[in-house]
Amino acid sequence: MIMEKGMNSGEGLPSRSSQASAAKVTVKELETQQPCKEKRGGFVLVHAGAGYHSESKAKEYKHVCKRACQKAIEKLQAGALATDAVAAALVELEDSPFTNAGIGSNLNLLGEIECDASIMDGKSLNFGAVGALSGIKNPVSVAHRLLCEGQKGKLSAGRIPPCFLVGEGAYRWAVDHGIPSCPPSTMTTRFSLAAFKRNKRKLELAERVETDFIQLKRRRQSSAKENDSGTLDTVGAVVVDHEGNVAAAVSSGGLALKHPGRVGQAALYGCGCWAENTGAQNPYSTAVSTSGCGEHLVRTILARECSHALQAEDAHQALLETMQNKFISSPFLACEDGVLGGVIVLRSCRCSSESDSSQDKQTLLVEFLWSHTTESMCVGYMSAQDGKAKTHISRLPPGAVAGQSVAIEGGVCRLESPVN
């Protein structure tokens, strides 16, 4: 598929709604020929959040995306399942103090960390998730374990295994299944604590004093950009392995100063992530991971909407229309001034390899895209043949309005795959 270029041209794509203006951005096509030798193949695309990423921290965001890609590819090359690889990428993202997931997550109103995470397997369609989880360093590890335990079948006495646990119940289940706990204080960083104190002061001031709304709004926006506290940086990843199986995962610390017990899109089915292998009614395997304002993503079930849209012939156009019509212009968000979110998507299909006449190999065509309505989104991607991951911070062009405009970029990767 040939996609158009024009990153900073400012030329607009035709809007499908009076509420949405779409910004045309560069889409690079990458052609990667991957030989199947001793190491297995695969591809990973990760994101470190949609929101606002300051130039001063761009290096850190790109670095953690690069490490996450490398961890996933190491798993894929060793023959691991797509779910294992996507979980490995998320653990790396959660361990970074610069992301709002795991260590360094946003603090809630009580100054505590409560995390959400989920993972979905495109082959079995099984799903695992945790919400408002405290005391566990890597929430995605609990979600992954829930998925794996669920695939084993029913529990004793015919009980249905859980796929989604929250709060204290999720914590106890994790510890009972050998996942180590950690003191909550070890997950708080000086950055997250400073942001909490700063945001708490703003909240207390707003509650005590009636002030000019415009002036307050400008002050908040300025502070957010200076301190990078305006990011809605849920992290996520999508993976396809050498057999063509896909998986997706997402993890988040949630909104700053959220109410204790609040669960966002990162834990909810069809909202935070989605993965589905090709089937009788699906010509493409698809995987999606979202980021942004959790309430906006929940009310639009954006991950599943994007996955279904990607069954259309033109993935680029299908994703653009979904972001415009199903997100920005969604009737479920009609009262919102600006709709903030981002997605990474991957779709794959098998086709005959022109360079290899062997009957036991096919080319796995992988199309990958990212799109956002926020000011920026940080992504990284890598195939099993690549020596290192590529990273990029996508930004809306000058003049585009966050919450009302759409940026979209992506590429294509070709992998050699064994025939099932």
From Swiss-Prot:
UniProt KW keywords: Hydrolase, Protease, Threonine protease, Zymogen
Positions of transmembrane segments: none
Domain of life: Eukaryota
Mutant phenotype after disruption: Tasp1-null mice are born with no apparent respiratory distress, but the majority dies at postpartum day 1 or 2 with no obvious milk spots, suggesting a feeding defect. Newborns are smaller in size compared to their wild-type littermates. This phenotype appears in utero. Animals that survive the newborn period are markedly smaller through adulthood, and display skeletal abnormalities.
An example Gene Ontology CC term for this record: cytosol
E.C. numbers: 3.4.25.-
Family that this chain belongs to: Belongs to the Ntn-hydrolase family.
Official protein name in the record: Threonine aspartase 1
Originating species: Mus musculus (Mouse)
